[in-house]
Amino acid sequence: MERMIERCAGLDVHQATVVACVLINEPGKRPRKKVRTFGTMTHELEALRDWLAVERVTQVGMESTGVYWRPVHAVLEEQFEVIVGNARHIKNVPGRKTDVKDAEWIADLVCCGLIRPSFVPSKPLRELRELLRYRRKLTEAQAAERNRLQRLLETANIKLGSVASDVFGVSGRAILRALIDNAASPAEMADLARGRLRRKRDELANALNGRMDDTHRFLLSMQLRRVEDIEALIEQLDQRIAEKLTPYQVEMALLVQIPGVDWVVAAVLISEIGVDMSVFLSVHHLAAWAGLCPGSHESAGKRKTAAARKGNMHLRTMLVAAAMPAVRTKGSYFKDKYYRLKARRGAMRAAVAIAHKILVAAYHMLARRVDYRDLGEAYLDRIDQTRTVANLKRRIERLGYVVSIMPKAPEPDTDPPLAAAA
């Protein structure tokens, strides 16, 4: 293999150690390798950085192994060009495997320019990404705790969820606290209802006439407190996220124009893909990186169905979730596209396809700095008509005819003229 870089290094990163191999290519001489092992404490990583600087290394390569690569990258990124590669792309040939051999293999790949760099956003975007990913975890924990609470109510035969549309609204929480205190009758608890729920007080009183014991009340108090604690954490996170989003207000204003994209989805898009679309070769590469492109499986000239490739799980999950409110937008292109695909391919594949469309729209809006333009619900009908005409024309021409297609002339108006007013 042709060696392109004179001085480079490969790192095999683990939880407690980093094995570093410096590869030196001097004209007219055989390549030389220097291998050292460092710990992963901050002062040890700084010693690694100083050693690489003494060896005049210009590029450093490593695998994206879990989260262990992140502290190493943070120490080295200011002084070296750091290439973080997908572990599946760097895998060595079968044979004896040691940490030293892995570091040497990575150094060889860096030297020959054979590692495809993974997308590593800037530090502000990495911080925003950490906040949003933790917010998602809290949201999932909140949903799980709410489900546990409602299952507990069903166990005690409290049918609050059958009458109230939102168990955790103002009325629902007041009733839950009354259930915990055990100081009111079902009719008195029904009087705590507010708004439209007051019209259902009789039905609500019957729903609250269950069989709650002390254990149920104890668990209910803990679960309600847990839900409220998570809500407080999410509120604090939202404030910090809003501060981090201050430099990206223009991009946020563009992205929220897309149907189904609220401020959370827009923030996730910015944190996961950034705002500079030039880091992706094309919109197709971005879709593949996100795991939203169709699978490709071709053998012996035959194309077969295949699952979508693995990609950015956080981005993919958020966009698939955003697809459902997007398809509920009346008169939108997404709605028509979803129901056409759902009839042929099923609901899940249709949702993934809409998520792909949202990502494509976001890419072009960020790359060109343009507003969102909906194609409309009738767009696919017009496309279908054009394709049908072209297919029929082609079939007739194969039979030896010359076809000229013109639009139909409007029919003359046959209604009698109205009599002039006297």
What do the predicted segments below correspond to?
Residues 1-422:
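A detector of single, family-specific signature residues
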